[in-house]
Amino acid sequence: MPCPGAPCCSLVATGSRVPFSGLKEEEEEDGEDDEEEEEEGFFQKVLTPLLSWLLSRRLWLGPQCSKLPLPSCCRQPPPAGPPVEGDGWLKSFQRSRRMCFTSKSFRPEPDMLYAQKAKGWQLTQDSGGWEVQDQCTRIWSKENLLALNTHSRRQKGKRENKVCVSTWQKSRGDRTYSSMATTPSMTKILEGCMYRKLKC
């Protein structure tokens, strides 16, 4: 049985499945012919394997996907060790990318994301009562990338999380933001950064 891919590794929002492949960027840069190819490589090499792994750990369960038997290839954790400049999956895109992940039963694990140990994760708590793990501070202060922005604040008295992908192009200073799902009932958020040095 093949590993469940993007159609099955979906997010739950307001009781319905939201296919991961439905992600859209609100602002698209003009004059970039390789944008589509870059996005496709990013999804195939980074997000789809990560979502499949989270699904195997029962952290994300869609109503239909939760009933599927998981093949052995979906039970493998990410490779040990942090990513370094020049890693294959870092070469697949040129812009800084930031990803936020939410889970109802998140427990910090040393192998949750590739760069966790190297970037010095710290468990903090904001004014809204959310537990937040972030690894972004050292990255954006050193590399001048996208500043850390927590999406787990209280809004109108209700807890609200957004699962998102943010991109930022250093050479033009453009920032695009894409919201994939909003789930009010989730209680914890995991924020991670995947990055490479940019050529301007």
UniProtKB/Swiss-Prot annotation:
The gene is ATXN8OS. One of its GO terms (cellular component) is cytoplasm. It comes from the Eukaryota. Keywords: Cytoplasm. Coiled coil: none annotated. Signal peptide: none annotated. The lineage of its organism: Eukaryota, Metazoa, Chordata, Craniata, Vertebrata. It comes from Homo sapiens (Human). Residues 19-39 are annotated as: Disordered. This is Putative protein ATXN8OS.
